[in-house]
Every structure is written in structure tokens, then in C-alpha cells.
């Protein structure tokens, strides 16, 4: 567990050192579904995010770190870390297919939970490898982006509890500056849909996290600073049915 945590922190350090990086800090108010309220309320999440285009394609990565401040969580610790790293390969920028790339991706994480004895136990979170096609339309500065992905998804699960007959994932990513012609307002987010076998039956999973940010720093010569909100909407993600988790946050852009 310590080795895995060390590798995760190395990833954090690498992402933070890159251009095109931002860091977000969210307070999670918990699920609007009262049956799930105690599972997600009163938690703080740090997200470190990177997007870096180059002449061979682009690299995207993020790391989520959840901090324990809820009475049911392990005390004084980062109790969950989750990361995604995706690389798009494109060697045909001058061809008619310039907006289409080959994408390879890794998803996974580590968590801490309480055992029946009251102690802490570590566990892995859906380690998965993905490969497929990425279609991306964007402005020259990538401030406005429209991105569709169709990926084959392999979930590493020795017990075959999560395997699906059609192991595909569909992803839609968007970003829009000056949303609704409002200067400094940015609307962005993603939508993931994939198939996954649940504990009892086949099911499909949906996760979307739309964000709305306002560049408050533009009013006092600090354009890196943003405040905003994120709403996590999921279906069959961490439990059965629909969950809606509103958050408030601040963001700092390093570029």
C-alpha cells in the first residue's frame, strides 16, 4: 500500500510540474438522494488536471485526492486517490482526418476503508486500460473544445465481477469560454457511459461532471483565480440508481 501511495504522489508531482495545469479544490455537500447522504457528505477533493497538446497529439491527465473530514471516514488522511492518464496519437495533421486520433488510456486508484475490526484496509479502484478513437474539434488555443471518444475498455478484475459482454466506453468532453457571451464564464465537463457487470446483473454506468467557473481574478489583476461549482450526476456508479452531488470550488490555472 505504501509503495502504491508513493507512486501516486510521484504522479501528482509530475502533473503539477507541467504546462497547461490547473488545481481545483471542492467541498462536497453530499448526495441529494437522502438515502446516500452519509456516504458522500462533508468531504473535500483536490483535483490536479493537465492538458498538453504537441505535434504528435496530446496528453491529458488528472488526479483526484479525497480528504477525510466525515465521521465515517478514516481520520486525518487522504482516503481516496484516483487518476486518469490519456494519450492521443496523431501523425496526420495535414490530412482530411486531422481531427481523428488514436487514444490509449489508464484509469485507476487506491482507497482506504474501515474493516469490521475497526482498522484500516486498502483497496484498488477499477484499474482499467482503454484504447480507441478520439474525434476532437477545437479552437487554436483549445479554450473551446468538443471531443467524442469511443474506447474499448478492459477492467482488471480477477473475480470477473465487473466484466461486461460489450466492453465499450463512450466519452463526451466539452469546454466553452465566455459561455452565453458572458466574459470570464467557462462551462466545461465530461460525460462517460460504459457497460459493467454489477453484483447481480449486467448494467450500464453513467457519470457526468459539468462545471461552471467564473474568473473572479480578472477584477483584481489575478486572472489565474476562478470560483465555481461542479455537479456530479451518476447512474449505477458507486451504488444502484441515480446520485446527484453538488460541490462548490475554487480553481487556479498555472498557465
What name fits each language-model region?
Residues 4-13:
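Sec-dependent N-terminal signal peptides
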Residues 27-31, 54, 65-69, 104-112, ...:
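Transmembrane beta-strands of outer-membrane beta-barrel pores
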Residues 153-224, 252-254:
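Outer-membrane beta-barrel transmembrane domain signature
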Residues 62-123, 205:
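Surface-exposed loop and membrane-interface regions of Gram-negative outer-membrane beta-barrel proteins
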Residues 42-46, 77-83, 123-131, 162-170, ...:
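Residues that define the transmembrane beta-barrel architecture of outer-membrane proteins
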Residues 18-66:
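Short glycine/proline- and aromatic-enriched beta-strand/turn motifs that initiate or cap beta-hairpins
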Residues 48-52, 83-91, 131-137, 150-152, ...:
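Residues on the lipid-exposed face of transmembrane beta-strands in outer-membrane beta-barrel proteins
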Amino acid at each position: 500500500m505504501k509503495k502504491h501511495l508513493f507512486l501516486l504522489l510521484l504522479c501528482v508531482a509530475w502533473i503539477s510540474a507541467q504546462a497547461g495545469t490547473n488545481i481545483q479544490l471542492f467541498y462536497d455537500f453530499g448526495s441529494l438522494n437522502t438515502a446516500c447522504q452519509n456516504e458522500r457528505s462533508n468531504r473535500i477533493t483536490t483535483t490536479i488536471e493537465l492538458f498538453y497538446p504537441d505535434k504528435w497529439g496530446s496528453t491529458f491527465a488528472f488526479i483526484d485526492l479525497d480528504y477525510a473530514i466525515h465521521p465515517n471516514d478514516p481520520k486525518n488522511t487522504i482516503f481516496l486517490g484516483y487518476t486518469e492518464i490519456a494519450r492521443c496519437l496523431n501523425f496526420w495533421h495535414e490530412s482530411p482526418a486531422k481531427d481523428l486520433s488514436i487514444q490509449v488510456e489508464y484509469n485507476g486508484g487506491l482507497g482506504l476503508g474501515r474493516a469490521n475490526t475497526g482498522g484500516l484496509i486498502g483497496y484498488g479502484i477499477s484499474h482499467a486500460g482503454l484504447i480507441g478513437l478520439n474525434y476532437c474539434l477545437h479552437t487554436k488555443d483549445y479554450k473551446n473544445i468538443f471531443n467524442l471518444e469511443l474506447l474499448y475498455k478492459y477492467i482488471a478484475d480477477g473475480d470477473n465481477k465487473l466484466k461486461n459482454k460489450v466492453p465499450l466506453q463512450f466519452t463526451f468532453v466539452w469546454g466553452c469560454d465566455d459561455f452565453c457571451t458572458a466574459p470570464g464564464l467557462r462551462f466545461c465537463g465530461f460525460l462517460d457511459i460504459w457497460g459493467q457487470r454489477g453484483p447481480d446483473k449486467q448494467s450500464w454506468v453513467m457519470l457526468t461532471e459539468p462545471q461552471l467557473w467564473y474568473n473572479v481574478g480578472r477584477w483584481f489583476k489575478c486572472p489565474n483565480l476562478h470560483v465555481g461549482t461542479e455537479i456530479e450526476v451518476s447512474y449505477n456508479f458507486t451504488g444502484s440508481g441515480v446520485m446527484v452531488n453538488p460541490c462548490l470550488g475554487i480553481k487556479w490555472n498555472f498557465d
